Swiss-Prot record:
A single GO molecular function term of this UniProt record: growth factor activity
GO term, biological process aspect, one: central nervous system formation
Keywords, in A-Z order: Coiled coil, Disulfide bond, Glycoprotein, Immunity, Signal
Organism, scientific name: Drosophila melanogaster (Fruit fly)
Record's miscellaneous remark: 'Spaetzle' means 'noodles' in German.
Region described as Disordered: spans on this chain: 179-235, 289-340, 390-419
Protein name: Protein spaetzle 4
SUPFAM superfamilies associated with the record: Cystine-knot cytokines
Residues annotated as glycosylated: N215, N287, N354, N463
GO CC terms: extracellular region; extracellular space
Entry keyword Amino-acid biosynthesis: no
Length: 597
């Protein structure tokens, strides 16, 4: 009896056990994927590792790229290996992100559009597949938008999902804007000669070499200068040439044959001492026109007096000025010359630079900046052009004998000018420029010392900073543009100074990229190195000047010309009014009582 009951229960127990085990297996198969999904998103499930692109090797992809990325860091052509499918999928799945990154679209508008148009219709999928399956020759905006009019007739067109982001790839060629350098032309205009003996706005500096070394300045203006007291020492007329500040040239060059003055020689009772005139220290360079050569004889002092048309008898005031830096050698041999009759004398006139008054005898010569420091003698800074003496011949009633055959200041200046150049030994280029001021006009247009090629490029392929070849996201209208200036003549001197050359500079950019060897990585951002600008780099600067920490040179003479004084005063008044108004507006009143009822 008992055995029979056990025999009956055993099949039932076996069935229950089998069913329980089956249910446990079903629960395990359902619970394992859920538990794995709870740890995070598996990127391997979102890509197709067995796809066509993943099976292609690195060599095949590099061969499919139309540019040699081993020679250059980018390629602006897509080629057949560009992953259009991954780029389109990323743009389609991140419409809000792309619109916020590339346009002025509010985030709430993007969210509203995504919520309302979150429907995925089979028609959209078929239309998109048909659109991108057509050949490239039939792709056009007119062909792609031919069904839009039919869709507008639908009642639910307002909520109809339109994939405007999925547009055709829009290729834009690389800009070929080149910066060409033009040769500056030189135009010279000569002012008419001044014939009259009375000159306006041109002061005559009378250097009086008395034993006390004092100088007096006589300003000649339409009047008769009374005769000064006769002195045994010599006197020389020095005309100060003053260029025009209103001209548009970089430098003002005064022609040596446009200004003439008339002077009358006066007999000298005794021979004067030998005088060596040295220019003022503020001019920077040495006075090349008045230095006497050691191999030549000392110059002969001449005596001259300024004359003018007798129109009035009002005496002109004489003001004392700080004596110039002069040296007198007392031990030098004296020149015994007694002039009994009026003779024709020659006075050496020095060109004074860095003056701001107007002179009708100035000649405007616009030249290029590079030609100013050329080593040839034909340049503007050649010693012959800089310190060429202006000679003025005084005409008298009767000719007489010439001065002694000794060396003259003109001959000595020519010898010294031919031996010394613009830059002294051990002198920096910036120091010479600081001593020799350049009157830069505001309306001149400069050129780059290193010519560049300006480009705006949206590359498809590029090498990142680790040397990996990546595809950049470049789908219209979400291209990633890079603007750079490339040297047209790299490692060449061009317009740089000696010892310098043009070199390309680079800059890092962070761009969205795609790795064709790892589709599971998706779209990510990486660093890329692209050209930025072209600079002029010098290598012959001494180490002592490199090591010293100096503030940057800022000379106001190289800056833009200052504004008119009246305009500057008006601007100062406006600024004072504005400061006063803001101070009264923002500052609380002192008499305000916070405890007032």
């Amino acid at each position: 009896m008992v055995r029979t009951q056990m025999d009956r229960r055993s099949p039932i127990t076996r069935l229950i056990t089998i069913e329980v085990i089956g249910y446990l297996l079903i629960l395990m198969t359902i619970a394992l994927p859920l538990s794995s999904a709870g740890f995070g998103f598996d990127s391997a499930n979102s890509c197709s590792p067995n796809g066509k692109i993943s099976r292609r090797g690195r060599a095949q992809i590099l061969a499919a790229i139309p540019c040699d990325l081993g020679q250059q860091a980018f390629c602006h052509l897509p080629g057949s290996a560009y992953p259009w499918h991954a780029v389109r999928r990323f743009v389609h799945e991140n419409q809000g992100l792309m619109k916020r990154m590339y346009g002025d679209v509010r985030h709430i508008s993007i969210l509203r559009d995504e919520i309302q148009n979150n429907e995925v219709d089979a028609d959209d999928i078929e239309e998109t597949a048909e659109r991108y399956s057509k050949d490239g020759g039939r792709r056009s905006a007119k062909y792609l938008m031919n069904n839009r009019d039919r869709d507008r007739e639908r009642e639910d067109f307002g909520s109809f999902k339109s994939n405007d982001v999925l547009m055709e790839p829009h290729f834009r060629p690389v800009s070929t804007i080149t910066t060409s350098t033009t040769k500056a032309t030189t135009t010279t205009t000569t002012a008419p000669e001044i014939v009259s003996s009375t000159t306006e706005r041109v002061p005559n500096e009378v250097t009086d070499t008395t034993p006390g070394n004092t100088n007096s300045t006589i300003s000649t203006t339409k009047g008769t200068a009374p005769p000064l007291h006769e002195k045994p020492e010599s006197e020389t007329d020095i005309v100060e040439i003053q260029p025009s500040p209103e001209s548009n040239s970089v430098y003002e060059v005064v022609s040596p044959s446009v200004l003439s003055t008339t002077s009358t020689a006066k007999p000298s009772s005794a021979a004067g001492e030998n005088i060596q005139i040295i220019d003022s220290p503020q001019l920077g360079l040495r006075n090349l026109s008045a230095e006497a050569s050691p191999s030549q004889e000392p110059p002969t002092a001449t005596t001259g007096k300024p004359t003018s048309v007798p129109k009035s008898t009002t005496p002109l005031p004489i003001r004392k000025r700080k004596p110039a830096e002069t040296t007198t050698s007392a031990a030098s041999p004296k020149v015994s010359s007694t002039i009994s009759t009026p003779t024709t004398t020659t006075a050496t006139l020095l060109i004074r630079r860095n003056v701001t008054k107007y002179s009708p005898a100035s000649v405007t010569t616009p030249v290029s900046f590079a030609s100013l420091f050329s080593g040839t003698s034909s340049g503007l800074f050649s010693p012959e052009r800089l310190r060429r003496p202006l000679t003025t011949t005084s005409s008298t009633s009767a000719p007489a004998s010439s001065p002694p055959a000794g060396g003259t200041p003109a001959s000595s200046s020519t010898g010294s000018a031919s031996k010394s150049g613009l830059l002294r030994e051990g002198q920096l280029f910036q120091d010479a420029m600081k001593q020799e001021p350049v009157a830069v006009a505001s309306n001149l247009r400069g050129v780059n010392a290193c010519p560049v090629k300006d480009e705006v490029v949206a590359p498809f392929w590029a090498n990142n900073t680790r040397g990996e070849v990546l595809a950049l996201l470049n789908l219209y209208p979400f291209e990633q543009y890079v603007h750079w200036e490339k040297c047209t003549h790299e490692f060449k001197q061009m317009f740089c100074r000696d010892g310098c050359r043009c070199e390309q500079q680079y800059r890092l950019h962070r761009l969205l990229a795609y790795d064709p060897h790892n589709e599971c990585r998706g779209i990510f951002s990486d660093w890329f190195r692209f050209p930025s600008s072209c600079i002029c780099k010098c290598y012959n600067i001494p180490m002592e000047f490199r090591a010293t920490s100096r503030s940057p040179r800022s000379d106001s003479r190289f800056d833009a010309p200052k504004s008119d004084p009246i305009e500057a005063a008006e601007a100062e008044v406006q600024r004072a009014i504005y400061e006063h108004a803001t101070e009264e507006w923002y500052r609380p009143r002192d008499e305000f009582d916070f405890l007032e009822d």
